[in-house]
């Protein structure tokens, strides 16, 4: 059985359940296109946190992820998968984006398994959550657009194979327009 469910619809439409909206992004502090741009318009405080993280850590974020509160909806967390140093036409190569996607999802998996912890001895995923998390991370539904396939130009089927590697550990709802 697949760990990926496809639905048609608008991923930004408010839902009545706890969810983590996952997107791939750059480490340069720019939510300038694709779903990231839509997130920036809708959740400017979350974008401010994202920019702060990027300014502090830069490319050291590659292969990591961070959870940000949306500040608008207490059931919505935003998960940034850091898969490329830069965005736009300066994005990384396809294989490195896929490798960093897998590493970042591994981090998310670790924190989901850690129940209500957002810090381990090696990493922190939720420095910005400060009371904005309602449930243990593992109870949030994981949702995403077809990550990497827009501005980063990675064929969706290749990212889909990375997601399938997490079968049994994480299930994803993928939104299609």
Curated annotation (Swiss-Prot):
InterPro entries: ADP-ribose_metab_enzymes, Macro_dom, Macro_dom-like
Xref: Pfam families: Macro
CDD domains registered for this protein in UniProt: Macro_Poa1p-like
GO annotation, biological process: DNA damage response; purine nucleoside metabolic process; tRNA splicing, via endonucleolytic cleavage and ligation
Enzyme class (EC, first level): hydrolase
Family stated for the protein in its record: Belongs to the POA1 family.
Protein name in the entry: ADP-ribose 1''-phosphate phosphatase
Natural source organism: Saccharomyces cerevisiae (strain ATCC 204508 / S288c)
Phylogenetic lineage: Eukaryota, Fungi, Dikarya, Ascomycota, Saccharomycotina
